[in-house]
Amino acid sequence: VYGCGVLLLLSSMFRQALLIRRLRRHSTQERIGRIVLVRPTAQIASFSFFRTIYISRSVAEKDIAAIFAHEKSHVIHRHSLERIVMESLKALLWWNPFAWLAARALTEVEEFEADRDVLAEGHDTGNYLKTIFTQQFGYSPDVADSLSNSLTNSLTKKRIQMMTTPMKSRYALLRLIAMLPIVTGLLAAF
């Protein structure tokens, strides 16, 4: 049973890598410095994989700069490598709920870090929030009647909260670093 779980998750990772490769092969590509921008005709959520950024041609021109900055942050911080390591650990520890929680927490931290970098580049917070909303839900928040139902318990809601509330403590990063040994110990215990 354990081996089947590991094999299933690792084969899923391999399948995703093949899909990314096929998407890149069937899309237009442009080199921007050390980064390759891939513009597929398929309507996909924007993402990066190592030094390659994928942004659908259906994305509005006004949103491309902020999305590119966000994905460039993922490239600079090597989040693809972190993700592969975490997904591999999750495959090996698939039965451990803490592995799944750690993977979700890593995703949140990576998104918060990328959002921080986008805002540090000088992108307008309000416009960037609209871009995130449009990317996540496929329509502009100007058209939405209520955000509360759509955003309940979502990563998008947490990202919006992180960008719109001031930092509560200088020591937030220190607290996060202090949590690493605890999380590592919990993962090792199971």
Predicted regions and their residues:
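Hydrophobic topogenic segments
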Residues: V1-F190
